[in-house]
Every structure is written in structure tokens, then in C-alpha cells.
Amino acid sequence: MSRKGPRAEVCADCSAPDPGWASISRGVLVCDECCSVHRSLGRHISIVKHLRHSAWPPTLLQMVHTLASNGANSIWEHSLLDPAQVQSGRRKANPQDKVHPIKSEFIRAKYQMLAFVHKLPCRDDDGVTAKDLSKQLHSSVRTGNLETCLRLLSLGAQANFFHPEKGTTPLHVAAKAGQTLQAELLVVYGADPGSPDVNGRTPIDYARQAGHHELAERLVECQYELTDRLAFYLCGRKPDHKNGHYIIPQMADRSRQKCMSQSLDLSELAKAAKKKLQALSNRLFEELAMDVYDEVDRRENDAVWLATQNHSTLVTERSAVPFLPVNPEYSATRNQGRQKLARFNAREFATLIIDILSEAKRRQQGKSLSSPTDNLELSARSQSELDDQHDYDSVASDEDTDQEPLPSAGATRNNRARSMDSSDLSDGAVTLQEYLELKKALATSEAKVQQLMKVNSSLSDELRRLQREIHKLQAENLQLRQPPGPVPPPSLPSERAEHTLMGPGGSTHRRDRQAFSMYEPGSALKPFGGTPGDELATRLQPFHSTELEDDAIYSVHVPAGLYRIRKGVSASSVPFTPSSPLLSCSQEGSRHASKLSRHGSGADSDYENTQSGDPLLGLEGKRFLELSKEDELHPELESLDGDLDPGLPSTEDVILKTEQVTKNIQELLRAAQEFKHDSFVPCSEKIHLAVTEMASLFPKRPALEPVRSSLRLLNASAYRLQSECRKTVPPEPGAPVDFQLLTQQVIQCAYDIAKAAKQLVTITTREKKQ
């Protein structure tokens, strides 16, 4: 626990003397100024604790000091040791530099962008590389070399990697070898102490069987780290995990007679909000609990920060962290909810924590929901029996009545104005917080629906105006085509259609090229005989593709009609096969399809051109032609043959896979924006893997035609995306590559994948509701 080492400790980021904070996940010590930047990055980048004023498990503090003294900082500053980097102007921050922008930019580049970490020479296949690194980590944790394991983790090794041959995770190996510090490092990077091996034994079992009882007890504490931290935040006590794993504080106020009405909200709305918390799925409840855990960490660090800083110089708006930073791995909705936790006052936040602890205990023990009125009556009876000696009680439970609070945190907890009672109810106080959050989300959704309705109305007006213009131009075009002479007798509609498609002498011309919408390049196949106005109506779509992906994926309950006007039959659901004459891949048809794919958003005023030989195909049909010509469809599409299966996966699973697809597409789009064409191939492999996993959720032969159509489009687009991305590598060295055209094709394929995924989410949600 001592901070004194064999050599003087300095800040890892600016070399300031006597650092007071530690970054647990990076294994370095930092000064106050640099710590303010670390806190603004978020726990997903750097987990910080004060060395003297925060509560530390002894082995965790020993792990941090071991890494710091053994040069863990060189992992994050590897390239700065290269003289070439010094000559290029890249340098480390100094203590005299300003926090903003010099220190902050350096720290963000160092830990968030990993700009100075040693890069592996070959990154073509990230999946194979990560697997090899994880196997090295699996072998290294049996030794005491922490720096090697941290270096492997920084390069992408997985702390929860399950070795396929040995049937264990790295934490199993560290527990068996008694490597406590290695186990601490693995847990910091997400290793699960309760994960079973191939025989169902956990790392805790390994440690006990090897005689490492202290390590086994520490792993149990790590397994209950979340609930222990929440309980310790409220009352300064933790369960000993021998008599029980949970302490459930209860709000109380002994100094007032009307304590129950002031400490608990007994309204019907509060009871409904409590029931909604209990009705959450395990995954959503875990996410909520982790978000509250991060908020507890932020508030505790805030309290230490305000107690230790010189308020006249350091405590400024820039150094403060008023809410949880954005985590790009989470959805926008979850990030907004995480930031709103900072608006809870102390009493509201304590009530939310009690509810989470009660619900966690109930779920872990498998108890059924109890009546809230029974709990309230029991709480009221216990409240009337309390003495009136203190305003605030320490909190204990029936399963841990003999444990004393930690001495290092006792003084801090006594200064908190919290009202606690000794109780071990499996159901805590009813709170309004969940109801308020849902109410705010509902108001936001309603406002968005109103806005979309207005946009829909304006687009409908614009559509009608365009239809009138098209009819007018069509009439003028017909007049210009008529040769001078006697007026011909009126013809039937079918004859007029033939006259439009046929020129003098029976020769066919290209049909009128319509202005393809930039919002919906993937237009569906249209039936014959439709007017150009109808075709434009089916092709118009009011939103950009990126908006469509975000709103459609994460707001699946909003009616699809509010997002777009386009309706029609997709290319994959046309009742004729690719081998039919309608979809025959002639040379000119292929060239025309390629041209339409490249100029999908361009408009042309040449109304005298007609299409030769090809029916009215949308862009989606053209892409279907290209796939048939180039690759004769991917074999994955053939797997959809077989008996009809009416089953559908759960909406939750489909949304999870869709989020993974969207995340990989966003990574590909970032690479395109940054002109990182060498990243196209690995990104397309990730997208193809995510698409394959998503398609595997559905039956081989779905009964619903829309599902089959969407799956065909999803698989075909993913396969075409791979083919386009492989074109970044020229077949011959030095051969020119049109990266601008290639990028357009890649973005188009990515859009088609996102659209197909959105359709599957919408269909699954609709079918599950019926």
C-alpha cells in the first residue's frame, strides 16, 4: 500500500513529480492536470483512481505499482523512443505545458488513438492476429511478467479468450498458477471470474483446488464487484461473501415522524416504474447496472477531486467532468441515458441504486416478484422500532451483521448526508426515475414523429408537383415525335405504349432516362405499363441513407411509412428467375446497368431516348443483373432452397446482429472518408461475417416472401461488397485503380446491406407483435 518505490515517481504523460493518480487500465501514474484529461476520456479509455484518497484492494494497487515501476509507459510511448519521431516534431508533453490543448491532445493521441503503440507488421487479417495474440496471452499469464501481458492486451489480445485446444481462458491459467497480479490485470480488461472451462469449472474453483485461497476470495470479490461498489458507495460497507453476497440499504430518516412518506414514493406511477425495472430483460438490466456503476465511479472521483485540488487554479470548467463521456461502442440512446444519470440528486440516485441492488439479488437467487405493499409494511414496522440517537445509520444486512466498515473510507462516508436503514429486503424502495426516463424518451419520440409527418407532407406535395411536370413534359414529347401531316386516328393505350417504345421503322430506342433519386439508389423493379410519374413516386425517398440506418435500426417501433414513401417489389422477390429473358444479361444491358449504378443520382433532360430491348428495370434489378453476370450469385443464396419454415428469430437477437453489421459498416465508411483503401478488405470481411451471423438466425427457407427477399439482398450485397473491396489490390503491380469509382461502389453496397438489415428488423418486429 505504500507509494514509495526505489526510484522517484513521475507523471507518465508530462513527467511532473509526485503523481497522485493512477490509471488502472494503462498501468501508469499521472499528475492532477493529466488526470483531468484521463477522466474526460471515459472509463472505456482510462480507469483512474486516487492513490491515497480512494479505496483500493491491496492486490490491485500492487498490480498498478508493479506495472508503473517496470516500464509499462513504454508500451504506450513506443514510437516516441524512435529518434526519427523526435526529428519529425512529435514530442512528449512537459509539466509547464498548458493542459489545453497541448497535454490534452498528447494524452488523447497516446491512449485513445494509440498513435505511439507498436504496430504489428501485418494487419491483413485482424481475426487471425487477435487469435494468435490471445493464445500468447493464454501462455504468458502463468508467469509473473505483467508488462508482457499488458503489451499483448494493448495489441488486441482478448482477456476472455477461450482456448479451443485446452478448453480454458487466461484467467483459469493465472488462477491455477497463483498469479494474483495477472488475475487482477485480466479482470481489469474484462475477464469473467465466473466463466466455466470445458468441464464447467470456474477460475475460482481452479484457485481453490491449487490451494490459493486468498486469490479465490479475491476472484469472488471481483465477481460481485458491481453490487459491492454500489453498496459501498451508499453505506461504506461491503459483504464478506462468506455469509452472503448482497447488502441492500434502505432509505430512512429517524429525525422525522413522517419518514416513510418522505423516503419512499408510494404513488402508482412509482410502482409502475418499479415494475418496468423488474420487467427488463437480463441484458438490458445488466447495461443499466453497468451505467450506474460508471456514474458511481464518476461521482466518487469528483468528490476526491474537489477535496484535493487547489480551487483557485485547477478546478475549472475544462477540468470538470459533469457527466459520463460518450462511449462510441454504445448506441446514441444509451449514451444519452448515461449522461442523464448526472442529473439525479443524491436521494434520487441512492433510490435508484437500492432498486438495482434489490433486483440484482432477486434475479441471482431466482426469487419471484414479491408484493410491494408487503415490503412497505415490513419497512414501516422496522422503522417504528428504531431508536433516535443518530440522524443517519450505517447500513447492514441480515446476512452480514458482523462486518465492520473499511477504516480508509469511514471518514468519507460519515460526511455524506445520506439516510440509511439496516435492512435486507429483496425489494427496495419504489422510485420514479425509470418512469421519468421513459416519459422523456416518449416525448422525444412523439416530437420526432411529428417532424417526420411534416416532412412526409412536404415531400408528398413536392411529389405531386413533379408528377404534373412529368405529365406535361410527356405530352410535349409526344407532340414533338409526331410527324407533320394528317392527324392519325386515336389509338388504344397499348398502341400508344408501343409507339413510345418503338421508333421509325420498328427500331427500338433507349427509353427515357428518369432522374434517379440520390436518396434511394436501390430502386425496386417496377411493373410494366406504369407512368413515369408513378415510377418516380415509387422511387422517391425523403431521407439520407445514414439517417435511415440509425433511425430504422434503433427506432424499430416507429411506423415505416413515416420514414419513406417508396413502396414496391424488391428485385429478389420478382416472380421470374435470373435465367428468364427479362433478366438476361446481354452485353449492352450490363453496360447500361453499370452506368446506372455509377450515375444513380444524376438527372437527364433527354426525354427522347428510350431503352433498347430492356424492360423498365430499377437500379436494384440492375445490380441483380450484375451479380448474375459476374459471379452467377454467391453460393450462400442457394442455401435458401428447401421446405418453408414459418419460424422467425427473436427481435432482440436480430437487433443485436444488426447493430454489429451497422458498426462494421461505419468502420468501413470511416476508412473511405480517410482514404484508407487498404482497410477495405478487412472491413468487408468483418461485414460479411456479421451478415453471415445475422442470416444464420433465420430459417434456411423462410415462409415469408419479404424475409426471403431481404435475405437475398443482404447476402448478395455482402458478397458484392467483398468483390468490390478486393479490387483495391490491383491484379498486376503498378496497374491503375480508380479509387473514386471503387469507393462509390463500396458505399452503395454498404447501403444495400444496411437497408436489407433494416427490412429484416422491421419485418421481425411486426411479425412478433402479431
UniProtKB/Swiss-Prot annotation:
Protein's cellular compartments: Cytoplasm; Presynapse; Postsynapse; Postsynaptic density
Entry-linked SUPFAM superfamilies: Ankyrin repeat, ArfGap/RecO-like zinc finger
Keyword match Calcium: no
Pfam families in the record: Ank_2, ArfGap, GIT1_C, GIT_CC, GIT_SHD
Disulfide bonds: none
Tissue note: Expressed in the brain (at protein level). Also expressed at high levels in lung and heart. In lung, expressed in endothelial cells, especially in capillaries; also expressed in smooth muscle and epithelial cells of bronchi (at protein level). Expressed in bone marrow mesenchymal stem cells, as well as in osteoclasts and bone marrow-derived macrophages (at protein level).
Annotated stretches, region: Interaction with IKBKG: 429-629
Gene Ontology CC annotation, any one: postsynapse
Domain of life from the UniProt record: Eukaryota
Residue numbers spanned by region Interaction with PCLO: 245-374
GO biological process, one term: negative regulation of ARF protein signal transduction
Sites of Phosphotyrosine modification: Y224, Y392, Y554, Y563
Ranges where the record places region Interaction with gamma-tubulin and localization to the centrosome: 1-124
UniProt function note: GTPase-activating protein for ADP ribosylation factor family members, including ARF1. Multidomain scaffold protein that interacts with numerous proteins and therefore participates in many cellular functions, including receptor internalization, focal adhesion remodeling, and signaling by both G protein-coupled receptors and tyrosine kinase receptors. Through PAK1 activation, positively regulates microtubule nucleation during interphase. Plays a role in the regulation of cytokinesis; for this function, may act in a pathway also involving ENTR1 and PTPN13.
Annotated protein name in UniProt: ARF GTPase-activating protein GIT1
